Structure formats: structure tokens, C-alpha cells
A protein has these predicted regions:
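Conserved S-adenosyl-L-methionine
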Residues: 53-172, 176, 189, 197-199
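N-terminal low-complexity segments that are often proline-rich with Ser/Thr-Pro
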Residues: 294-295
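Class I SAM-dependent transferase core
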Residues: 36-59
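A conserved structural/catalytic subdomain of Rossmann-like adenosyl-cofactor enzymes
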Residues: 143, 155-157, 162-287, 291
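Short secondary-structure junctions and interdomain/linker hinges
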Residues: 20-28, 45, 49, 71, ...
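Long recognition/docking surfaces used for binding and targeting
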Residues: 1-44
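Generic structural signal for hydrophobic core residues of well-folded globular domains
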Residues: 21-24, 42, 68, 186, ...
């Protein structure tokens, strides 16, 4: 994928951002996906991302972090990490839980608990810059193809406990193969949350996947969440445990409270998201409501 016509320009820009970051105190940042914002601004002036890359809104990365109950002790993987949005959000939340950036635990989180893979060379550069901006040494970021054996072996060698991902949707990039490889190579019992197009992993197309792993929940997301016009859902799996007769909890988050602002994308201008997020987390951590269902 060519983010801009001249790759030297984007490399120079990233270098400038990193240089500026050395003069900025990012200790109190909350895991903002700085380079993801940069990428999306460029893509607003392009017809369509050639690689199917659609970066995840910040409020959804935070929601998914809570949805699978990630904590400071977890080892988090994003095997299609894009600009690193899930990883910087996880890093910020985990460091906050251990008492801040200056703790010994915070240093361990940055060096040993965040793992990312990105196939696209230019996007990988964004992820590295993003982690550097947030004072992380990009220790566990790799430029690999999650569809291939080398990436599978790399994943298998890591002590992953949670997975947060929004893989590229284009058919030629093998979204289903990516999901299968992740589920097959993380430890048994790993909780995984994937954002996928609604029809990408319908139950009748999963086949052997559910013979090995459990699909716990499907949360349909608002239809206008992504500018690309793709309708998506969050699929939550637990690895290494066959589905058998277990039911799948399904629900529809019709509204996230954000509104489109001209030339600025979608924003929570009425501060509705916090209450909406609390409602859905409460619903998903308790019994199903009458308005929602089990598949």
C-alpha cells in the first residue's frame, strides 16, 4: 500500500513526529493512536485504502479492552496491528493500573507484555513511531505476514493471554486465514476480540473453527462507525475449547453516541459515549436482556 505518493515524505514526517515527541511529556497520555489519526486524515483524501486497512476508533479500542477484561498482568497481541492503536491503548490502561509510568511494573509492561505484527511496510513504520511516541521501544513489533508460517511460529513463541484485533477486510488479504492462524497459535483459554465484517464469520461458514474454539459473543456495531461504509461486529472467542452446544450471545449496539462533524469525522460532541459504554459492559457481563438473543 502506498500511503502517500512519495514514501520519503512520510518517513521524514514520522522522524519529525518522533523528534517532537522527545520534547513532549507523554507520561499522562491515555493511549491516543497518534499515528492512526495521522493515517486516517490522509485517507480522507483518498478514494479507498488499497489494503483494506480501516483503523479502529479510539473509543472502540477502549471498549474492547474492557470487553475481554484485559488487566495489567496480561500479554496482549494484535497480529494485524496497523498503526498500533490497540497496543498503545492497552499500554496506557495497564500502566495506569500499576500506578503510573515511573513504576517498575510499567517498564515491564512496555518491554514484555505488548506484541504486534504488521504486514505492510509503511504501516509498520507508523506503528513503530506510535510506540516510540508513547515512550515504548517497539521491542515486540514485527513486520510479518500473519497468513504465513513464520508469523504463526512467532505468535506461538509468545505467552499471549489476550488478543485485540481489527484485521484488513479485503478478501485478497485472507481475513479468515488470519483469524484461524491467531486462534490456532495462541495458548488454550486465550480470550480474543476481533472486529470483522458482519458476514465474514457467519456461524454456518465457520466449519472447523468451532470444532476447536468457542465463539462466545457477537456485538454488532453501529452501521456508520467506519467511513468505509462497512458494517461490522465484534466477535469474541475463547481458544482451545470446542463450541459443542454452547450458545452464542448476540446483540446490536445501534448507537454509540458519536456524531459526524463536517470535515472532522465522528466525535462525541454530546458526551454520550461514557454512559453508552457502561450500559453495554454491564449487559455483556451479566445475563442477556429480553431485547437481545442467543444464537
Amino acid at each position: 500500500m502506498n500511503i502517500v505518493e512519495n514514501q520519503d515524505d512520510i518517513n521524514n514526517f514520522i522522524d519529525c513526529v518522533i523528534d517532537i515527541s522527545h520534547s513532549v511529556n507523554s507520561d499522562y497520555w491515555n493511549g491516543e493512536d497518534v499515528m492512526g489519526i495521522f493515517f486516517n486524515e490522509f485517507n480522507r483524501y483518498k478514494k479507498k485504502s488499497e489494503s483494506g486497512q480501516v483503523f479502529t476508533p479510539e473509543h472502540i479500542t477502549s471498549f474492547m479492552y474492557d470487553l475481554i477484561d484485559v488487566s495489567y498482568s496480561d500479554k496482549v497481541l494484535d497480529a494485524t496491528c496497523g498503526s498500533g492503536g490497540f497496543l498503545v491503548k492497552a499500554m496506557a490502561n495497564m500502566i495506569k493500573e500499576v500506578g503510573g509510568i515511573n513504576t517498575k511494573e510499567a517498564e515491564n509492561i512496555k518491554k514484555n507484555q505488548l506484541f504486534g505484527i504488521e504486514f505492510d511496510r509503511e504501516i509498520f513504520a507508523l506503528a513503530c513511531a506510535n510506540m516510540l511516541i508513547h515512550k515504548d521501544g517497539k521491542t515486540n513489533l514485527e513486520q510479518l505476514d500473519t497468513r504465513e508460517t513464520k508469523a504463526c511460529e512467532w505468535i506461538k513463541s509468545k505467552p499471549i493471554t489476550k488478543v485485540l484485533m481489527n484485521p484488513p477486510y479485503e478478501r485478497k488479504y485472507g481475513c479468515k486465514k488470519i483469524i484461524e492462524n491467531v486462534l490456532e497459535n495462541v495458548p488454550i483459554g486465550t480470550k480474543c476480540a476481533f472486529i470483522l465484517p458482519d458476514k465474514k464469520l457467519e456461524k454456518d461458514r465457520m466449519g472447523n473453527l468451532l470444532k476447536k474454539h468457542t465463539l462466545e459473543s457477537i456485538i454488532k456495531l453501529p452501521e456508520n462507525l467506519f467511513d468505509a461504509g462497512i458494517t461490522t461486529s465484534i466477535f469474541i472467542f475463547e481458544t482451545g475449547k470446542p463450541q459443542n452446544e454452547r450458545k452464542v450471545f448476540a446483540c446490536y449496539m445501534e448507537d454509540d453516541g458519536l456524531e459526524r462533524v463536517k470535515n472532522q469525522g465522528r466525535h462525541d460532541i454530546k458526551n454520550r459515549w461514557a454512559e453508552i459504554e457502561r450500559y453495554w459492559l454491564c449487559l455483556l457481563f451479566t445475563s442477556p436482556s429480553p431485547r437481545d438473543g442467543l444464537l
